[in-house]
A protein has these predicted regions:
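FAD-dinucleotide binding site
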Residues: 1-227
């Protein structure tokens, strides 16, 4: 494939490559790396002025921040192997002290263990989690489109599905937060029930998405974007 920069007729640059990968996020970079390892020539095109996609690190007012993805899970064997190959060091998550919960009305509460909500809300949370686990168990995480109801499930907004299971706003907000803000980094009306099922299926069950000993295990020295 030939790539041509036609913005200036006097400064045309042509590149001959076997494959063009669109997007320099994690998927694009891994794809390009594997193609190169297989002996192909590759060009990666990225519209932004940086690589890494949802992994993004910045220094703001002299302090280093990871704005995007940053965690290394205990069961992410492929990522850990890559970190070893690149000589990247990790450090454990801070585990001491209380957790902080901000309720829907803005009240700040410190807690350990379960969320500081009513028993009824806890029951509604469990109801939604059980329903999501049951659906996630029905799909192949490597090929979710093969589910017999894939098109139907992909046409249902996750927010709509949650609202149909419970009228407990606090319970919905908590489950919504884990999948939407915590995992997929976008509002729950912007993705489908099928995508939520895939997220849970990729971790085997919902509990693994929120287990701090599994999901939020380590971080990378220098930030995940440096990988």
């Amino acid at each position: 494939m030939t790539l041509s920069n036609a913005s200036s007729s006097e400064n045309t640059v042509e590149l001959e490559r076997d494959v063009v990968v669109i997007g320099a996020g994690i998927s694009g970079l891994v794809t390009a790396r594997r193609l190169v390892e297989a002996g192909h020539t590759v060009a990666v095109l990225e519209a932004r002025d940086r690589v890494g996609g949802r992994t993004w690190s910045q220094t703001i007012d002299g302090e280093f921040f990871e704005i995007g993805g940053q965690w290394v899970s205990s069961d992410q064997d492929a990522l850990k192997a890559l970190l070893r190959e690149l000589g990247k060091e990790t450090f454990p998550r801070y585990r001491d002290g209380n957790s902080i919960y901000i309720s829907g009305d803005g009240e700040r509460r410190e807690f350990r263990g379960d969320f500081p909500v009513s028993d009824t809300t806890q029951q509604q949370i469990q109801l939604m989690v059980d329903a999501l686990d049951e659906l996630a168990a029905q799909i192949d995480a490597s090929a979710p489109w093969n589910h017999p109801r894939a098109a139907e499930l992909d046409g249902i907004q996750f927010s709509t599905w949650l609202a149909g299971l419970s009228d407990d706003a606090e319970a919905i907000r908590i489950v919504d937060h884990y999948i939407a803000a915590g995992m997929l980094t976008k509002p729950s009306h912007c993705f489908s029930l099928l995508q939520a099922m895939l997220m849970v299926a990729s971790a085997e069950k919902f509990e693994h998405l929120i287990d701090e000993g599994i999901l939020l295990d380590e971080r990378v020295v220098g930030g995940m974007q440096s990988v």
